[in-house]
Amino acid sequence: MTELLQVAQHADDLERARAFYTKLLGQEPAGYFDPPGLLFFRAGGVRLLLERGAPSAMIYLRVDDVEASVEGLRADGVEIVSEPHVIFTHADDRLGPPGSEERMAFLRDSEGNLVGLVSHHPVSGG
């Protein structure tokens, strides 16, 4: 079996990235090595590596409520690129819980990278 182990994301300023992701993920880093410029967080079963030399990647984080998360981040001065919206309705369980809407929003992290926030909600009527 193959599983996703780690995602690397570019960070010019590791201290700034550390503060941003500590607040966003609600946890302290799992590891910090400078030099050479590596900052690790645990995100479920996947390591998030913030590294000076990494290319920019796009990550998606599952949150309980994308609308509430966006409002909290906006209050902290985070740039919201795209407001929460329904991206997909799941009829079966291939990509998400059946009978749910997948809502996404996009923001810029402290290093200018695009980050997606995702939550699932029961399909709304109408």
Segments from the language model and where they lie:
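N-terminal beta-strand motif that seeds the catalytic metal site of vicinal oxygen chelate
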Residues: 1-15, 57-59, 118-126
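Core segments of cupin and vicinal oxygen chelate
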Residues: 2, 8-48, 68
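Short glycine-enriched loop/turn motifs at secondary-structure junctions
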Residues: 1-3, 51-56, 98-99
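Conserved catalytic-core motifs of GNAT/GCN5-like acyltransferases
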Residues: 28-33, 83-85, 119
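Vicinal oxygen chelate
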Residues: 14, 61-114, 121-123
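Active-site beta-strand termini and strand-to-loop segments that position acidic
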Residues: 40-44, 52, 107-110, 120
